[in-house]
Amino acid sequence: MEASVILPILKKKLAFLSGGKDRRSGLILTIPLCLEQTNMDELSVTLDYLLSIPSEKCKARGFTVIVDGRKSQWNVVKTVVVMLQNVVPAEVSLVCVVKPDEFWDKKVTHFCFWKEKDRLGFEVILVSANKLTRYIEPCQLTEDFGGSLTYDHMDWLNKRLVFEKFTKESTSLLDELALINNGSDKGNQQEKERSVDLNFLPSVDPETVLQTGHELLSELQQRRFNGSDGGVSWSPMDDELLAQPQVMKLLDSLREQYTRYQEVCRQRSKRTQLEEIQQKVMQVVNWLEGPGSEQLRAQWGIGDSIRASQALQQKHEEIESQHSEWFAVYVELNQQIAALLNAGDEEDLVELKSLQQQLSDVCYRQASQLEFRQNLLQAALEFHGVAQDLSQQLDGLLGMLCVDVAPADGASIQQTLKLLEEKLKSVDVGLQGLREKGQGLLDQISNQASWAYGKDVTIENKENVDHIQGVMEDMQLRKQRCEDMVDVRRLKMLQMVQLFKCEEDAAQAVEWLSELLDALLKTHIRLGDDAQETKVLLEKHRKFVDVAQSTYDYGRQLLQATVVLCQSLRCTSRSSGDTLPRLNRVWKQFTIASEERVHRLEMAIAFHSNAEKILQDCPEEPEAINDEEQFDEIEAVGKSLLDRLTVPVVYPDGTEQYFGSPSDMASTAENIRDRMKLVNLKRQQLRHPEMVTTES
């Protein structure tokens, strides 16, 4: 009986072998009755199956049956006990009926068991769950009865199913393997061939069965001890229940038969494989030396452009694709031959090595030719790519040189010059790269004759060489023309830089001169408090005028230079119509203001000098001091100077400009008036000396 047949019944857990043992090493059979009515037929089937598992030796030690009646009725318990007598009378040595806390009528139950004792053939005792340890050790009881033994019914059932499946499959597989192996050991070659066709493959995979067996054996060996706290807990999957030696014996037999089966398969496979290898080797060799070589002989050009080279590459890839299929066959054949050589059969070694050498020579030669052709086309594609990039760079540079631009300022000219230099440098780098690519391609072409298969490729090579050299020479000429044009443009740009610089500096000179004029009118307003200070101011003013004169002369020189540069560049000077009039206008204004400033300072010097002579006490010159004309002259100069301070500077265009602010002019005028008052006071003293004496 197999567990898979009665699986639904076994899942109900009507009875089970927990793996625990009594004090006589007899197995403990547990029947957990429940509130629901127990199906006695199913219980009987379950008991039959469970009692078929242990070995005869184990059965001889007898069973201790625990009937858990705590959730059942007495009549059910009695029926089960009686059924045990019918099912396993010889194997049962003790039946422990676990009673509930509120048990049935003790007299009735005691009377009934005592009455049936001789007929049952085994001892039946009624015991509470907590008193079971009097008959069975706690470590052999499950947790339901207060013990420490762990039992998982579904786990046990699953392992049991695996065990039975393995036993069934391994037994069937052993028969099949024995039939195959025995058929291979006897009979003639024809019978062997026939046996290969009919019985060569077993119904199940031996590897799978062996793996299942090893996993099962490992599980059995590991589950023998799974206790805790130093106690030993016997699992229901130990060697006494599931016959661990039986699994080991089946595995040993399977390994032996499977090893023989593998050898039979290897020998048969080797014979068939050798014939297939010979046939495939000749197919590969014949194709590579025939159609494959013809395809390569027809391809020698490199193309005259990127598109042409790409088309040739695409054609070559198609050829490589066809070859790759045969190379894949070669790799597979080489692996097969190597495997057969490693087998070490002397009778096949010479033939296999010869086939391997012939195949390798042809394939490597053809692969080298394909690689050479691919490298040549790749080099040609790179050469044409560099040539195209260089041509585009030259076109861009030439287009830039052919456009006559009018830069707005020197910065844009510098940027244009920098861009030209960068483009020219990029062209130099591109041309150098083209030469390197071209020389590498020429070197490869010179080696092309070695792969010619006897074909004269002189014409094809000459066309390729002429094309490469022609491209490089053409690029060199175009680059030289661009360099010449760049030199011309560079000279023109530098002249334009000078032109803009002169214009900028001339405009700056106008600004400086305007600033000097502004400073003259706003800050150069003092006339001095005495003659000495006024003379110092006049000297400073002359130096100030020298600076302005230098600035004006510098601006004129710059504008003259712009005229010369414009004539050289054949362009209209912007400065001659704008900057020069402004420069002359500002200079004219500065000249007028400067002359007015000089005139005022000279008048101030004359005024202060005469005033100081009168105001100083000079007894050596009494006649001079008493000269009324001098007083009149001083007074006239002072008044004239005061009037001059109120007069603005008038420019040629009619505009007027005052020196300083009104407060500045008032301060200067007040100083002059004070000096005039002192002179008048001195005059009065000289006219009426007695007034001075009386006052003193």
Swiss-Prot record:
InterPro entries hit by this protein: CRAL-TRIO_dom, Spectrin_SESTD1
SUPFAM superfamilies: Spectrin repeat
Expression by tissue: Broad expression. High expression in thalamus and brain. Significantly expressed in vasculature.
Domain (CRAL-TRIO) ranges: 1-153
Keywords, comma-separated and alphabetical: Repeat
Keyword Phosphoprotein part of the UniProt annotation: no
Coiled-coil ranges (or none): none
Signal sequence segment: none
Any Gene Ontology CC annotation: intermediate filament cytoskeleton
Alphabetized PROSITE patterns for the sequence: CRAL_TRIO
GO biological process, one term: negative regulation of calcium ion transmembrane transport via high voltage-gated calcium channel
Repeat positions for Spectrin: 275-378, 381-494, 500-602
Pfam assignment, any one: Spectrin_SESTD1
GO MF: phosphatidic acid binding; phosphatidylinositol-3,4-bisphosphate binding; phosphatidylinositol-3,5-bisphosphate binding; phosphatidylinositol-3-phosphate binding; phosphatidylinositol-4,5-bisphosphate binding; phosphatidylinositol-4-phosphate binding; phosphatidylinositol-5-phosphate binding
Function: May act as the primary docking protein directing membrane turnover and assembly of the transient receptor potential channels TRPC4 and TRPC5. Binds phospholipids such as phosphatidylinositol monophosphates, phosphatidylinositol diphosphates (PIP2s) and phosphatidic acid, but not less polar lipids including phosphatidylcholine, phosphatidylserine, and phosphatidylinositol. The binding to PIP2s is calcium dependent. Might be involved in the plasma membrane localization of CTNNB1.
Family: Belongs to the SOLO family.
Assembly notes: Interacts (via the spectrin 1 repeat) with TRPC4 and TRPC5 (via CIRB domain). Interacts with CTNNB1.
Miscellaneous information on this protein: Called SOLO because the encoded protein is related to but shorter than DUO and TRIO.
Name the record gives this protein: SEC14 domain and spectrin repeat-containing protein 1
Organism, scientific name: Homo sapiens
Gene name per UniProt: SESTD1
